[in-house]
């Protein structure tokens, strides 16, 4: 306590204001200087420090608000993306099902058209075979007829005389003429 009262006593023996100098007595001047410096710092620095802290607080709050808004926007975008993904997956499933149905339908159409084509080819083959059989039969008939005719002509030529032959030809021509008149 004596030290405390001694410091006030020293205040009474303050040096005159006329001289300016550097006080080297650290123990005597330090608490007073420190209290004055702290007092000035507290008095003037309090407002500046409050302003700095308020500005920092506002920036932090703004950053938090912006982060919250960005988070809400990101959550909304995520929900929208999930909804679009569900829609795309649903449509992909529809396309997949429709694709399988379309493939089955095309497969059946291809099988049916191939069956029809094979049936037509079978019919064409049968018609061609029938046509070739008829043509071959007609050719055989024609050859048989020509051979029979040539054989008959040969037999007639050997059996008939020229005069008999001419009469037979004239009689046959007459018969053909009569038949022609009847048919006309």
Curated annotation (Swiss-Prot):
Parts of the chain that traverse the membrane: 27-49
Function: F(1)F(0) ATP synthase produces ATP from ADP in the presence of a proton or sodium gradient. F-type ATPases consist of two structural domains, F(1) containing the extramembraneous catalytic core and F(0) containing the membrane proton channel, linked together by a central stalk and a peripheral stalk. During catalysis, ATP synthesis in the catalytic domain of F(1) is coupled via a rotary mechanism of the central stalk subunits to proton translocation.
Membrane topology, from the record: Single-pass membrane protein
Misc note: In plastids the F-type ATPase is also known as CF(1)CF(0).
Keyword vocabulary terms for this entry: ATP synthesis, ATP-binding, CF(0), Chloroplast, Hydrogen ion transport, Ion transport, Membrane, Nucleotide-binding, Plastid, Thylakoid, Transmembrane, Transmembrane helix, Transport
Cross-referenced Pfam families: ATP-synt_B
Biological source species: Arabidopsis thaliana
InterPro entries: ATP_synth_b/b'su_bac/chlpt
GO MF: ATP binding; proton-transporting ATP synthase activity, rotational mechanism
A GO cellular component annotation in the UniProt record: proton-transporting ATP synthase complex
Subunit structure: F-type ATPases have 2 components, F(1) - the catalytic core - and F(0) - the membrane proton channel. F(1) has five subunits: alpha(3), beta(3), gamma(1), delta(1), epsilon(1). F(0) has four main subunits: a(1), b(1), b'(1) and c(10-14). The alpha and beta chains form an alternating ring which encloses part of the gamma chain. F(1) is attached to F(0) by a central stalk formed by the gamma and epsilon chains, while a peripheral stalk is formed by the delta, b and b' chains.
Annotated protein name in UniProt: ATP synthase subunit b, chloroplastic
């Amino acid at each position: 306590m004596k030290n405390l009262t001694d410091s006030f006593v020293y205040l009474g023996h303050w040096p005159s204001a006329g001289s300016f100098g550097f006080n080297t007595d650290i123990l005597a001047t330090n608490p007073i200087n420190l209290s004055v410096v702290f007092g000035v710092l507290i008095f003037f620095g309090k407002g500046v420090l409050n302003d700095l802290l308020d500005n920092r607080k506002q920036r932090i709050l703004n950053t938090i608000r912006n982060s919250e808004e960005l988070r809400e926007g990101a959550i909304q975008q995520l929900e929208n993306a999930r909804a679009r993904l569900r829609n795309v997956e649903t449509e992909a499933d529809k396309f997949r099902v429709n694709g399988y149905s379309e493939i089955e339908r095309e497969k059946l159409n291809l099988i049916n058209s191939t069956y029809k084509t094979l049936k037509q080819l079978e019919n064409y083959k049968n018609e061609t075979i029938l046509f070739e059989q008829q043509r071959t039969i007609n050719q055989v008939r024609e050859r048989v007829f020509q051979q029979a005719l040539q054989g008959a002509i040969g037999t007639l030529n050997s059996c008939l005389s020229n005069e008999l032959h001419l009469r037979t030809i004239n009689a046959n021509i007459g018969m053909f003429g009569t038949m022609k008149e009847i048919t006309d």
